[in-house]
Amino acid sequence: MKVFSFTVVVVMILSLSAFVLAGDEGDVMKKIVAMEEAVEERACLAEYQKCEGSTVPCCPGLSCSAGRFRKTKLCTK
């Protein structure tokens, strides 16, 4: 969770810097949203990879299925 918080802070600092330096606000906002979504997706995949017997659901767009050795279930596309 600390890595996620640190990553979000870094993304926000970079986003604000890009916003100040850029002339076109529309493009900057699209890039900021894309970066934040990518960070959230990576954090979600890192934290919620195993899904069998867990109360935490898989990330959006993923489903719980048997893993490679079928001992555990993993969130996969």
Swiss-Prot record:
Coarse class of the protein's main subcellular location: secreted
Q: Supply the residue numbers of the propeptide(s) excised during maturation.
A: 23-42
**UniProt subcellular location:** Secreted
Q: A Gene Ontology molecular-function term? A: sodium channel regulator activity
- A GO cellular component entry from the record: extracellular region
Q: Which domain of life is it from?
A: Eukaryota
Q: Which cysteines link up through disulfide bonds?
A: C44-C59, C51-C64, C58-C75
* Leader peptide range in chain numbering: 1-22
Tissue occurrence: Expressed by the venom gland.
UniProt keyword list: Disulfide bond, Ion channel impairing toxin, Knottin, Neurotoxin, Potassium channel impairing toxin, Secreted, Signal, Toxin, Voltage-gated potassium channel impairing toxin, Voltage-gated sodium channel impairing toxin
Say which family it is in: Belongs to the neurotoxin 02 (plectoxin) family. 04 (U16-lycotoxin) subfamily.
Entry's free-text remark on domains: The presence of a 'disulfide through disulfide knot' structurally defines this protein as a knottin.
Q: What does this protein do?
A: Inhibits Kv11.1/KCNH2/ERG1, Kv1.1/KCNA1 and Kv1.3/KCNA3 voltage-gated potassium channels and Nav1.7/SCN9A voltage-gated sodium channels. In vivo, intracranial injection into mice causes lack of coordination for 10 minutes, followed by fast recovery.
Q: What is this protein called?
A: U11-hexatoxin-Mg1a
Provide the taxonomic classification: Eukaryota, Metazoa, Ecdysozoa, Arthropoda, Chelicerata
